[in-house]
Amino acid sequence: MNTLRSYIKSFLLWELLLGLKLTGRYLFTKKVTVQFPEERTPQSPRFRGLHALRRYPNGEERCIACKLCEAVCPALAITIDSEQREDGTRRTTRYDIDLFKCIYCGFCEESCPVDSIVETRILDYHFEERGEHILHKEQLLALGDKYEAQIAADRAADAPYR
């Protein structure tokens, strides 16, 4: 009896009809696809995108060259060189992030004791020339200056959970 039933189901293309029924059910529902460049979905304040270096309100860089972010980076994407200033404090002379190596894990942001390195909400960027994938200190500071209001708002929204 089971063999007869399986022959009837295969002759009537029962699996095909079940698939068409499923397709028909979703054919008239609301679409969930987002056309990305034209439409944007809301982002979380914790989104991890392009990196930026922050400054204090008086304009001084926050980075104290402790090199914790360089040590904690699992992909070895961060390179830091530093020197001592006349007042005895250390400051960075070189701060490079290789975006081809970076896995955007956020460990650098978590390990920074002065909240100097942050990951912004910038997710779409491209490179036209070889070597542009390495962000230098000046570029990172410029990104931090440009998006400081958004970075501060995101940090404030995330503060109760830190």
UniProtKB/Swiss-Prot annotation:
* 4Fe-4S ferredoxin-type domain location: 53-83, 93-122
Binding positions for [4Fe-4S] cluster 2?
Answer: C73, C102, C105, C108
Question: Where mainly located?
Answer: membrane
**What is the protein named?**
NADH-quinone oxidoreductase subunit I 2
Q: Which UniProt keywords apply?
A: 4Fe-4S, Cell inner membrane, Cell membrane, Iron, Iron-sulfur, Membrane, Metal-binding, NAD, Quinone, Repeat, Translocase, Ubiquinone
Question: Can you name the source organism?
Answer: Nitrosococcus oceani (strain ATCC 19707 / BCRC 17464 / JCM 30415 / NCIMB 11848 / C-107)
Q: Name the gene behind this protein.
A: nuoI2
PANTHER family associated with the record? NADH DEHYDROGENASE [UBIQUINONE] IRON-SULFUR PROTEIN 8, MITOCHONDRIAL (PTHR10849:SF20), NADH DEHYDROGENASE UBIQUINONE IRON-SULFUR PROTEIN 8, MITOCHONDRIAL (PTHR10849)
The annotated subunit structure for this chain is:
NDH-1 is composed of 14 different subunits. Subunits NuoA, H, J, K, L, M, N constitute the membrane sector of the complex.
